[in-house]
Amino acid sequence: MKKIILALIRFYQKFISPLKPPTCIYTPTCSEYTYQAVKKFGVFKGLFLGFKRILRCNPLHEGGEDPVPDKFYIIKGRRLD
């Protein structure tokens, strides 16, 4: 399942994303962040982090550098093992 999700993200990056203007306020982009998160934490945790990131990607947030965290947290500072 992980390989399928990663392939779908790459498909989006190569064929869909170039058709629209860049809108992501973060580095790496939201799709790359989600790709890295799925690769690092697995499908469910990675997609959860990607979903949280996409919700933050709007004009109400500052944007900037936002790498995938080293550890998985649902709420900042509260680790879920």
Curated annotation (Swiss-Prot):
Subcellular location: Cell inner membrane
Main location (coarse class): membrane
Membrane topology: Peripheral membrane protein
Keyword annotations of the record: Cell inner membrane, Cell membrane, Membrane
InterPro entries cross-referenced by the UniProt entry: Membr_insert_effic_factor_YidD
Pfam families xrefs: YidD
Gene Ontology cellular-component annotations: plasma membrane
Source superkingdom: Bacteria
Recorded family membership: Belongs to the UPF0161 family.
Main function: Could be involved in insertion of integral membrane proteins into the membrane.
Record-given protein name: Putative membrane protein insertion efficiency factor
Source organism (scientific name): Thermosipho melanesiensis (strain DSM 12029 / CIP 104789 / BI429)
Origin organism lineage: Bacteria, Thermotogati, Thermotogota, Thermotogae, Thermotogales
